[in-house]
Amino acid sequence: MRVLYGVVGEGMGHAIRSRVILDELVKRHDVQVVVSGRAHDYLAKRAGEHLAVKKIWGYQIVTEDNEVQNFKTLVANVKGALLEGGWPKNIKAYFEVLRSFKPEVVISDFESWSYLFAVNHRLPVISVDNMQIINRCKLDPALTLGHEGAFQVAKGIIKAKVPGAAHYLISTFFYPPVRKGRTTLHPPILRPEILAAKPETGNHLLVYQTYTTNPALPALLQQSGLECRIYGLKRDLKEPFVDGRLIYKPFSEAGFIDDLRTCRGVVASGGFTLMGEAVYLHRPMLAVPVEKQFEQILNARSLERAGYGLCAEELTEARLAEFIGRLPEFEKGLSGYAQDGNRDLLEKLEEAMQAAAGTGIYEGDDPSVA
């Protein structure tokens, strides 16, 4: 089967998940990937006989001081689309894919270009991501408390992103009731290096900061009493830089995974991918969601509710100390978590592809629910 696979390029979580799925798909199918941002370079390395990777333009999110800057995000995206050739580049890619590949089914990891291609050519779409949980599941009001407006905005955007798909596969470590049809929940997709990692409890914190605009973080970490191995805050490093208890490290996938599997706990944002990996390896996590990013708030609050760590919507010395003091409690909570690799989602994806092939896109969503 010829598969068009769209991957959103904001952040690396979607690309890491897609890499695992693509490695499985190319065993039986020919796949054309369309992807934007840094994710393109990551996935392009995997191109081969049955996998082609094409770069498109995609939106970006601007953050400062651990908060999404809505106006600057708007300006950056208008500039990218109109002044830097983003939309013309995407139109060119559209006709290239139409001429040379002729897909039979489309898979979208929260990516719009591939979805619009499917709509225009009456192709079935399968959604694979973690975001649709906000739209297609019933969330406990306690999880949205204080962020009801952000929840409704996020829900509306996500609902409009890939409407009317043949099936929605949602990757998650928490399981709210499903409220819409054609929707299934599955454990997180994990890269093989994580599945092969053997967790050992060391005496350091792993700190991962995607955005470099959180100037207060280093001073707080110095008060932790633990060695902190930090990735992301100093991106130009070629070798580790030591500042007291803080060890800033250049990014290395192997080094990062080793620090993750041996850490006492993780301090990071509310992004889903690392959170899922930490849960799988039974590593407690202090999740600091980016402000105004409801998906991260939901992830962090759900993590705390499950007993796997803490949510810190504002990171303070007291909250960090509480996290460290409760590490044994979180370790106990995590001890009961288990999943059978990636089998669950991958089997359902193949089943959904075979069922959807040749059926055309659905006319609309389940009319019984908003």
Predicted regions and their residues:
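A short, glycine/small-residue-rich beta-strand->loop->alpha-helix junction that serves as a flexible
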Residues: G6-R19
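Conserved nucleotide-sugar phosphate-binding/catalytic loop shared by glycosyltransferases and other
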Residues: G9, Q32-G85
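Donor-nucleotide binding loops and adjacent catalytic segments primarily
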Residues: L22, I189-G265
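Short N-terminal targeting/anchoring amphipathic segment
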Residues: F95-E111
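A donor-sugar binding/catalytic signature common to diverse glycosyltransferases
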Residues: V105-D109, D259-L298
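Active-site-proximal region of nucleotide-activated glycan assembly enzymes
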Residues: P124-L185
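Nucleotide-sugar donor-binding patch of glycosyltransferase catalytic domains
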Residues: F241, P250-F251, P284-F330
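C-terminal amphipathic helix plus adjacent low-complexity
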Residues: E322-A370
